[in-house]
Curated annotation (Swiss-Prot):
Species name: Oryza sativa subsp. indica
Protein name: APETALA2-like protein 1
Region Disordered: start-end pairs: 1-100, 119-174, 347-367, 401-433, 460-512
Extent of Polar residues compositional bias: 21-32
CDD domains: AP2 (cd00018)
Length: 512
């Protein structure tokens, strides 16, 4: 049996074209139909009695799958051709059919790239811009942070400058530079108070003074500027000194309150070319002028003497206080001078009462002079009436100053005849006794005088006898008593019953 391959190929081509025309659906449906037709034709191929040809190449296999699919679809329409298909052996399609199939397959993936390209564009658009801004922000973040802190401490430095000397403080502990004096001053705190240790020309010297004071005040554990071993000699010397004494030693070692071109305390160069000595801040005054001197040392010594007189041996001086032992008065002499000074301005014994009481006691003051008052007080303290009795010249001094009112006669020294008669009567009991001038006293019943103001017992019980009262009434004391009664003061004058001698009475009347 002979088979014409050409006829079979033509019939297959015609069937394929017919199937392509009938299948106007999508590519997916044709593929499914091809799978179904392939599955249906597989048993027919296995049952064929013809000798199978050698295996076709890979492109022939693909083409064979298409041919079988088309032949299966065409078999339903033409049953007469079934025998021919079973007997026919599949063969590779002709060359022009292979090209037609390749062209057909190239049309399927042509629509796929468009969505892929669109998806890629959507994926690439949002991603690139995101990382770039983040990188830029991180790069610029660190630089702006450092600039703000530096300007803050600058205003604090400006505040310190207002404090004046504190703006140029030293690097050493307890040392400060003062522009007003141009020196380095050292201070230390003790019991809540700042103790001045002195002014120095260099900060190093001021720091040394502070270290010595700190060791003295706080012990070897104190915070100091230099090593503790540098002050071993000073520690041995300061054991026998108190804090105050040691501070005075440090101040003497300093340059003191130097002004101008002088290195001594309290000395300055005057515009006239001489050296002026003055002591400041004493008794609330700005300074005390001590004079001009030809040499700087003389002015410094004048300052030292004035400081010792005002502040004692503990005064801060330019030189050792022992150098002025022969030039300064001793303590006893200084005390004596103070006593004389106080007595010269003290009130007399008769006026030691209160001002109110003196104003209502008829103004009877015996002692008016400061000199007489001081002599009287000294004699009263010594309790030596005989010494006063031997001084007749004191009597006229007591009557130098008349009373305040001249219209009324002086009650102590009456100048009328009645007073002379009373004195003659009182003189008869004892004519040889002379009564000193201080025998007359003023006594107030409301305010009796203290006992120590009466050096001699002038008063007795007989002073209130009728004879004494009548004598007082007949004398000039009657007017004083009347005035005292009007003033509601019962002040009387008592005297010794022994009347004064004729010499004293005559001397008394002669004076008036």
């Amino acid at each position: 049996m002979e088979l014409d391959l050409n006829n079979v190929a033509e019939g297959v081509v015609e069937k394929h074209e017919t199937a392509a025309r009938s299948d106007s659906g999508t590519s997916e449906s044709s593929v499914l139909n091809g799978e179904a037709s392939g599955a249906a034709t597989t048993p027919a191929e296995e049952g064929s009695s013809s000798t199978p040809p050698p295996p076709p190449p890979p492109p022939a296999a693909v083409l064979e799958f298409s041919i079988l699919r088309s032949s299966a679809s065409a078999s339903g329409e033409n049953d007469a051709d079934d025998d021919e298909e079973e007997e026919a052996t599949p063969s590779p399609p002709p060359h022009h059919q292979h090209q037609q199939l390749l062209v057909t397959r190239e049309l399927f993936p042509s629509a796929a790239p468009s969505p892929q390209h669109w998806a890629e564009l959507g994926f690439l658009r949002p991603d690139p811009p995101r990382p770039h801004p983040d990188i830029r922000i991180l790069a610029h973040a660190p630089p702006p942070a450092p600039p703000p802190p530096p300007p803050q401490p600058q205003p604090q430095a400006a505040k310190k400058s207002r404090r004046g000397p504190r703006s140029r403080s030293s690097q050493y502990r307890g040392v400060t530079f003062y522009r007003r004096t141009g020196r380095w001053e050292s201070h230390i705190w003790d019991c809540g108070k700042q103790v001045y240790l002195g002014g120095f020309d260099t900060a190093h010297a001021a720091a040394r003074a502070y270290d010595r004071a700190a060791i003295k005040f706080r012990g070897v554990e104190a915070d100091i500027n230099f090593n503790l071993s540098d002050y071993e000699e000073d520690m041995r010397q300061m054991k026998s000194l108190s804090k105050e004494e040691f501070v005075h030693v440090l101040r003497r070692q300093s340059t003191g309150f130097s002004r101008g071109s002088s290195k001594y305390r309290g000395v300055t160069l005057h515009k006239c070319g001489r050296w002026e000595a003055r002591m400041g801040q004493f008794l609330g005054k700005k300074y005390i002028y001590l004079g001009l001197f030809d040499s700087e040392v003389e002015a410094a010594r004048a300052y030292d003497k004035a400081a010792i007189k005002c502040n004692g041996r503990e005064a801060v001086t330019n030189f050792e206080p022992s150098t002025y032992d022969g030039e300064l008065p001793t303590d006893a002499a200084a005390q004596g001078a103070d006593v004389d000074l106080n007595l010269s301005i003290s009130q007399p014994a008769a006026s030691q009462q209160s001002p109110k009481r003196d104003s209502g006691s008829l103004g009877l003051q015996i002692h008016h002079g400061s000199f007489e008052g001081s002599e009287f007080k000294r004699a009263k303290n010594d309790a030596a009436p005989s010494e006063l009795a031997s001084r007749p010249h004191r009597f006229p001094l007591l009557t130098e100053h008349p009373p305040i009112w001249t219209a009324q006669p002086h009650p102590l020294f009456p100048n009328n005849e009645d007073a002379s008669r009373s004195s003659d009567q009182k003189r008869k009991p004892s004519e040889g006794v002379a009564v000193p001038s201080w025998a007359w006293k003023q006594v107030s019943h409301h305010h009796p005088a203290p006992p120590h103001t009466l050096p001699l017992p002038f008063f007795s019980s007989s002073s209130s006898s009728p004879s004494s009262s009548s004598a007082a009434a007949s004398s000039g004391f009657s007017k004083a008593a009347t005035t005292a009664a009007a003033a509601q003061h019962t002040a009387t004058l008592r005297f010794d019953p022994t009347a004064p001698s004729s010499s004293s009475s005559s001397r008394h009347h002669h004076h008036h």
